[in-house]
């Protein structure tokens, strides 16, 4: 590394070259230069001719320049307030600035970011130019680039249980070339070529599925491994193998993955810390040397800034402060990012955080994928303006894909790349793009955004309206024709001529391409990851406290169950209870590690993103987690042993106490490591939970307690030695039973052992030599190291499961292009002007037109803790202030405001979707006070987050919504016709059989999902529709389709209100009225828009100081620009107050008053029933959806059946024919152990795997319940019914395997009893898992509760300690353990009627029936009662699940 740095410095010295600060090193901005602030004129304190002060400053600079390089680059001169109150320059350590100093410095250089950023960047550039330092530049070329993917044909693409099984078998056979592949190739990018130049900002446009994301990923070296790429990509003539593309460039994904527990600032600081400073330090060294030689003194604040950002490994950096200001995130810098559990930043802020995460690094080529989703047009414009300044001043290479760029944003770009159907339609200067399309015969109309025109002109459905050659008849111009036309156009020919001249590699700047894999040293990477892990642990401290409390409670229970007064010593029978106590301790310390599984899976998405961007190596992520859990592991082990060791009455020796502590600690460490590894291996909750339970099962069963080593089939003995549990169990029993108090002589001549302790060890096949204790400790530590190593390997090589490609059914024999966005048939996408509402077809079902009026609406939430910590006073935070407005039938209203203005909050309040907070004010529906129960029946709410059941198709989603929300008197045929009509309207017919999927994982794209959200509400035939950002995340064409749908809906007489972020001119002017809000939740305009927004423009232009709108400018963007807080402060006005006093508001108040009074002869809304459909139909519809959801969820059900077969066969082999021979006590123990394991582990697997499945559907349930689709009870019943259906089949498979392999009696009665108890057992376990999800906020807490109560059930199952031996004060709980009833039923029904003789060590012979009755309390005549109790358990868990679903709502809105 040092050698490379010296080369760079030498190159700079020789050529005057080393690159500037890359685009982030040029961070910061300047309001006034230091010299401007402290120049001599007038009253400046430094302006007087006092030579002493000037000399003092000169001396300080001279002293600074004489310091060694290392120290000099860490010292800067900043103005400080002296003791006498004067301001003077003081030298400061720039690597250790206090937050106040950082803020002061940022204020000096970047007071008003909108105005000062460009000045500041120029000052940075001027500093490097002044001494002749050249900036590194990157030119990216791609030649003949093609990308292909595999796709399954027809309905085999749907992930049903059947299809996945067949596809898996085919894939396995295909690996061995036994079967040809059934997949076919699909072209995503088709032989494209182009050049991306530095210092020019390029806009990537194209309809959805045109290949934009694939192109950006290919250029950034981030292409999915499952795709095949051909062609060539070079950076400055160098191919990817010659440098590290992930460090040379930065790819900004459209998916926002962040840790919800960290604040915005912490997230950016961590990013900046890991990505490093690139060549900033070498630049500064050379810059400082040259300035000293030339006698140049830099601006002190610029010098301090550049020095501060050039030092790598800092925990916090000024780059973070700069990026926070640049992206407008400084207002939420110390707010948690948030997740499903925590309230955090808004969607728009999250999107900007994703952008900022890569901006804080040193990359000089940036590929940004849809960075404007969820942002208003004003914010998008500002960010793109700052990016343009960065590109032009710092010579950065940048490509940005945007969905709906406003005209003013579009004009910021220098070059355009237009993609369609995987082909390049145009690439070149923005100035020539309209000329090209005119050359092809198409013209962009006036008042039409060029970007919108470009995305529509290649579409088959929209092209004709732009045809300009009236003398020639129109015929469709295909994408291929456009592409060929571009090659003959002058811009295409110029591009071809540039390609003929290869890039001169010799001109490549040595700092342009990065060859080091990571940005900082391994030590600094480890420290950064360690600090973050510690922070995440502190933020999740509740879970760790909960775990510690859990283990404390379990240890208290263990010590009271195995209380020393009940624990006698000296005989073999006494030893059996100690075995149970030791095994139970072991189980708890193992189970306590299972929470690590959920944590690991939860953190993987962010890890995979950061690993692929080379933030850090996998070991740096893994090791801190391992090291920080050691103290926790020790605490848990100490708590357990401190509470249980002497109270249970283990060997009193102090040495044995500490040896048992060591064994517990090693077992806990091994368990944590194992579950971390399994989490990384499984990667999803369902697979990881299944794998975790299977691993537990294997290590437990082979641990030596459930089945003796001597009874394991000889060919499976190797499994015994590979079970970590065996070593933990061996260490504990050797430590206990080789103590002198177990040294009484053995009287049983059939066992070759001297003492009772040795008899106890040998009877279960354990070793009797003391040195085995240390061998076992060594083995446990070895397993800990092995599992951590495997964890790192899994993190290194495995990729996330699932991908973002939609599962769309492609019919064989039909030509379907991925990337063509054209549906079948349909009219041109044109938004109907507001002045001519002709009659519309569609939406013909009868409905009642309703108005909504609201006044003086205020909304408060409890003051967030982080704001209180910052000194904000008050108990409540007000989000809406005296908001008033009216929405009428047939009138389309836009609700507009910048991010944080309270648009979604207002909509949630009006729609009755808030679950918390305090609402004040009046809300009336057609003059009557709003009643939420009836309002839900007549309203629809299209949420911003597009929440749908992931495992059903688009058509099924719509049929389901219509089935439950349309009134019962509409017949099936009419309902289906209506659904077809809505699908036609929203252009969903081509996606009819597509799986919906999970956002960002699989299934529908963002815009397809958005259209589905709208369609789901439209099929309900509502009178009032709320739409929260219906065009967010859509390209211009998709937005136009959506808005045409909305317009058509309004024209049928419905009341529609939409929040909207970045409307184009034609979208904005399709609205009739506007409610404009500013930050703080205040209204600043409420009224009609007028033709071409005339009334809106007149209102704001009448306010003194507001700049006039330019011709052709988007009124929506202009309106947001002139009402920003900075404009308010510049003009010294309050737009909210101006509106309150305006005539527009008086008219608004009159309208509100009019609509708040019921019309004469009208009646309030009334429905005979709360829901549209009766109880039976609700249940039937819910069951129908649940059935298809489960059938198409192979991750859940295929894993469930695979686990059933694997566990069944494993137990069958381990306990082969144990049911036929029960001759001695150990045979009965093995038989009991077989049933105990068979019941507990597969039951626990069912409980664990059902939880994530129920949790996903619960989010959908909250939306559907709020929409008034059904009661909670039919939903609960149907979900349970589907699970019971699968449990029935699962039990059949399991019973046949176990019953035949273990060797039970083949009689009808015994087989029925076995099947019955197994079935009811699996059902209550599944219901128990579902119940915990319904009663807890999320499935992570549900998982912790599950393991906690499973420990109870396990302890009191009757296996670890038989019922007659349980102390009297705990015996009642035996009857409260469902597992105990199941074991009672199975064992008694199979062998409880046998009179065969069993030999008991140390006691003698006894009949099996008597032994079961006296030793275990099992009575054959009690079986019918046991059978009834199983039904009771199922009903208890069913009612608890239904209660949780009906009455508990953990959604926070």
Curated annotation (Swiss-Prot):
Keyword Nucleus part of the UniProt annotation: no
Induction statement: Induced by cold/dark treatment, 2,4-D, epibrassinolide (EBR), sodium chloride (NaCl) and cadmium (Cd).
Tissue expression from the record: Expressed in roots at low levels.
Entry's transmembrane regions: 542-562, 582-602, 621-641, 661-681, 687-707, 773-793, 1196-1216, 1230-1250, 1289-1309, 1311-1331, 1341-1361, 1366-1386, 1422-1442
Pfam family, one: ABC2_membrane_7
Domain ABC transmembrane type-2 stretches: 524-737, 1177-1391
Superkingdom of the source species: Eukaryota
Annotated binding of ATP 1, by residue: 206-213
Coiled coil: none
Molecular function terms, GO-annotated: ABC-type transporter activity; ATP binding; ATP hydrolysis activity
CDD domains assigned to the protein according to its UniProt record, in alphabetical order: ABCG_PDR_domain2 (cd03232)
Residues that coordinate or bind ATP 2: 897-904
Gene3D superfamilies in the record: P-loop containing nucleotide triphosphate hydrolases
PROSITE patterns assigned: ABC_TRANSPORTER_2
GO terms for cellular component: plasma membrane
Protein family according to the UniProt entry: Belongs to the ABC transporter superfamily. ABCG family. PDR (TC 3.A.1.205) subfamily.
Function: May be a general defense protein.
Protein name as catalogued: ABC transporter G family member 34
The species this protein was found in: Arabidopsis thaliana (Mouse-ear cress)
């Amino acid at each position: 590394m040092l050698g490379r740095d010296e080369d760079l410095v030498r190159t700079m010295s020789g050529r005057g070259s080393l690159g500037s600060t890359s685009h982030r090193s040029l961070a910061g901005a300047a309001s006034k230069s230091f010299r401007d602030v402290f120049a001599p004129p007038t009253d400046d304190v430094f302006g007087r001719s006092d030579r002493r002060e000037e000399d003092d400053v000169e001396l300080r600079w001279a002293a600074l320049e004489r310091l060694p390089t290392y120290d000099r680059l860490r010292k800067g001169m900043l103005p400080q307030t002296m003791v006498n109150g004067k301001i003077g320059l003081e030298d400061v350590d720039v690597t250790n600035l206090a937050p106040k100093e950082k803020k002061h410095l940022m204020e000096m250089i970047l007071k008003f970011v909108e105005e000062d950023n460009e000045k500041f960047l120029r000052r940075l550039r001027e500093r490097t130019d002044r001494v002749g330092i050249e900036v590194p530049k990157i030119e990216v070329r791609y030649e003949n680039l093609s990308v292909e993917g595999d796709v399954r044909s027809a309905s085999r693409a749907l992930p049903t249980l059947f299809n996945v099984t067949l596809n898996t078998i085919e894939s396995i056979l295909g690996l061995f070339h036994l079967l040809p592949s059934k997949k076919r190739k699909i072209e995503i990018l088709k032989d494209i070529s182009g050049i991306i130049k530095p210092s020019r900002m390029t806009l990537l446009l194209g309809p959805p599925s045109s290949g934009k994301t694939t192109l950006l990923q290919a250029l950034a070296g981030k292409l999915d491994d499952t795709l095949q790429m051909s062609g060539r990509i070079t950076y400055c003539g160098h191919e990817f193998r010659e440098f590290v593309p992930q460090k040379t460039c930065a790819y900004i994904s459209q998916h926002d993955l962040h840790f919800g527990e960290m604040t915005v600032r912490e997230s950016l600081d961590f990013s900046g810390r890991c990505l490093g400073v690139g060549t900033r330090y070498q630049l500064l060294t050379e810059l400082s040397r040259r300035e000293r030689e030339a006698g140049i003194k830099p601006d002190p604040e610029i010098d301090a800034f550049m020095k501060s950002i050039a030092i790598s490994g800092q925990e916090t950096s000024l780059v973070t402060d700069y990026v926070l200001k640049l992206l407008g995130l400084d207002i939420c810098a110390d707010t948690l990012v948030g997740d499903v559990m925590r309230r955090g930043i808004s969607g728009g802020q999250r999107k900007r955080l994703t952008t900022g995460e890569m901006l804080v690094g040193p990359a000089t080529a940036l590929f940004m994928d849809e960075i404007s989703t969820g942002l208003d047009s004003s914010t998008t414009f500002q960010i793109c303006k700052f990016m343009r300044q960065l590109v032009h001043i710092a010579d950065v290479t940048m490509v940005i894909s945007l969905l709906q760029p406003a005209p003013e944003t579009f004009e910021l770009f220098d070059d355009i790349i237009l993609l369609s159907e995987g082909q390049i339609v145009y690439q070149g200067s923005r100035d020539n793009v309209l000329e090209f399309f005119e050359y092809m015969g198409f013209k962009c109309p006036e008042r039409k955004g060029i970007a919108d025109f470009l995305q529509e002109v290649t579409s088959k459905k929209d092209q004709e309206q732009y045809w300009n050659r009236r003398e020639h008849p129109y015929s469709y111009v295909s994408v291929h024709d456009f592409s060929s036309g571009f090659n003959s156009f002058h811009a295409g020919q110029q591009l071809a001529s540039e390609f003929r001249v290869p890039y001169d590699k010799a001109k490549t700047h040595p700092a342009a391409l990065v060859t080091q894999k990571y940005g900082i040293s391994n030590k600094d990477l480890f420290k950064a990851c360690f600090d973050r892990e510690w922070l995440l642990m502190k933020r999740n401290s509740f879970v760790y406290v909960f775990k510690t409390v859990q283990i404390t409670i379990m240890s208290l229970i263990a010590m009271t169950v195995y209380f020393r007064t009940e624990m006698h010593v000296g005989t073999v029978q006494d030893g059996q209870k100690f075995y149970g106590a030791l095994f139970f301790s072991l189980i708890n310390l193992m189970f306590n590690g299972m929470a690590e599984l959920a944590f690991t899976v939860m953190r993987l998405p962010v890890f995979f993103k950061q690993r692929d961007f080379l933030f850090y190596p996998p070991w740096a992520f893994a090791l801190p987690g391992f090291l920080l859990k050691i103290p926790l592991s020790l605490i848990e082990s100490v708590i357990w042993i401190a509470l249980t060791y002497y109270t249970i009455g283990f060997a009193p020796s102090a040495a044995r106490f500490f040896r048992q502590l060591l064994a517990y600690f090693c077992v806990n460490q091994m368990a944590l490591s194992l579950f971390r590894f399994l989490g990384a291996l499984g990667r999803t909750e369902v697979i990881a939970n299944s794998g975790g339970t299977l691993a537990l099962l294997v290590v437990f069963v082979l641990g030596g307690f459930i089945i003796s080593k001597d009874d394991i089939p000889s060919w499976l003995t190797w499994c015994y030695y590979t079970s970590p549990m065996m070593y933990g169990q061996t260490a504990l029993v050797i430590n206990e039973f080789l103590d002198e108090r177990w040294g009484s002589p053995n009287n049983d001549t059939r066992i070759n052992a001297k003492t009772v302790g040795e008899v106890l060890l040998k009877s279960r096949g354990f070793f009797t030599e003391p040195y085995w204790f240390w061998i076992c400790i060594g083995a446990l530590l070895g397993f800990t190291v092995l599992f951590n190593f495997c964890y790192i390997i899994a993190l290194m090589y495995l990729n996330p499961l699932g991908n973002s490609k939609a599962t769309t059914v492609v019919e064989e024999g039909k030509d379907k292009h991925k990337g063509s966005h054209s549906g079948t048939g349909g009219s041109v996408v044109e938004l109907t002007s507001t002045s001519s509402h002709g009659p519309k077809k569609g939406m013909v079902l009868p409905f009642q037109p309703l108005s909504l009026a609201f006044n003086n609406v205020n909304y408060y939430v409890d003051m967030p803790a982080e704001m209180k910590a910052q000194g904000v006073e008050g108990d409540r935070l007000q989000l809406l202030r005296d908001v008033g407005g009216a929405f009428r039938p047939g009138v389309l209203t836009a609700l507009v405001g910048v991010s944080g203005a309270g648009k979604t909050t207002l909509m949630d309040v009006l729609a009755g979707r808030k679950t918390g907070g305090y609402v004040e004010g009046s809300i009336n529906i057609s003059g009557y006070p709003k009643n939420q129960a009836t309002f839900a029946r007549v309203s629809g709410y299209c949420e911003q987050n597009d929440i749908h059941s992931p495992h059903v198709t688009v058509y099924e989603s719509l049929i389901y919504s219509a089935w439950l929300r349309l009134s019962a008197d509409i017949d099936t045929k009419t309902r289906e016709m209506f659904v077809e009509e809505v699908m036609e309207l929203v252009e969903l017919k081509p996606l009819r059989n597509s799986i919906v999927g999970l956002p960002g994982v699989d299934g529908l794209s963002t815009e397809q999902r958005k259209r589905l959200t709208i369609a789901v509400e439209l099929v309900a035939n509502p009178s009032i529709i709320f739409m929260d950002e219906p065009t967010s995340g859509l390209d211009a064409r998709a937005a136009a389709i959506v808005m045409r749908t909305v317009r058509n809906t309004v024209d049928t007489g419905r009341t529609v209100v939409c929040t909207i972020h970045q409307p184009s001119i034609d979208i904005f002017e399709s609205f009739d009225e506007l409610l404009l809000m500013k930050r703080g939740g205040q209204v600043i305009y409420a009224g009609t828009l007028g033709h071409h927004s005339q009334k809106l423009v007149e209102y704001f232009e009448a306010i003194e100081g507001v700049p006039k709108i330019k011709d052709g400018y988007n009124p929506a963007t202009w309106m947001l620009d002139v009402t920003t807080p900075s404009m308010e402060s510049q003009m010294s006005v309050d737009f909210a107050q101006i509106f309150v006093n305006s005539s527009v508001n008086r008219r608004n108040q009159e309208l509100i008053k009019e609509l708040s009074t019921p019309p004469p002869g009208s009646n309030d809304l009334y429905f005979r029933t709360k829901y549209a459909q009766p109880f039976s139909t609700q249940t039937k519809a819910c069951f129908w959806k649940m059935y298809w959801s489960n059938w198409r969820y192979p991750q859940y059900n295929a894993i469930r059946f695979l686990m059933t077969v694997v566990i069944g066969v494993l137990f069958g082999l381990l306990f082969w024919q144990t049911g036929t021979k029960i001759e001695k006590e150990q045979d009965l123990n093995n038989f009991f152990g077989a049933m105990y394991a068979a019941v507990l582990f597969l039951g626990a697997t069912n409980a664990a795997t059902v939880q994530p499945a129920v949790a996903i559907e619960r989010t959908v349930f909250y939306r559907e319940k709020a929409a008034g689709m059904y009661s909670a009870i039919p939903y609960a019943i149907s979900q349970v019914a589907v699970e019971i259906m699968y449990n029935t089949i699962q039990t059949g498979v399991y019973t046949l395997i176990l019953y035949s392999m273990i060797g039970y009696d083949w009689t009808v009665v015994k087989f029925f009893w076995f099947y019955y108890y197994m079935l009811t057992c699996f059902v209550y376990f599944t219901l128990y898992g579902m119940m915990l999800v319904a009663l807890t906020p999320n499935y992570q807490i549900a998982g912790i509760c599950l393991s906690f109560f499973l420990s109870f059930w396990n302890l009191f199952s009757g296996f670890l300690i038989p019922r007659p031996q349980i102390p009297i004060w705990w015996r009642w709980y035996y009857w409260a353990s469902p597992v105990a009833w199941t074991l009672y039923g199975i064992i008694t029904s199979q062998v409880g009627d046998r009179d065969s003789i069993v030999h008991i060590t140390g006691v003698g012979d006894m009949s099996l029936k008597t032994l079961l009755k006296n030793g275990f309390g099992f009575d054959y005549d009690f079986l019918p009662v046991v059978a009834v109790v199983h039904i009771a358990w199922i009903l208890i868990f069913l009612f608890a699940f239904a209660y949780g679903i009906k009455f508990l709502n953990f959604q926070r809105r």
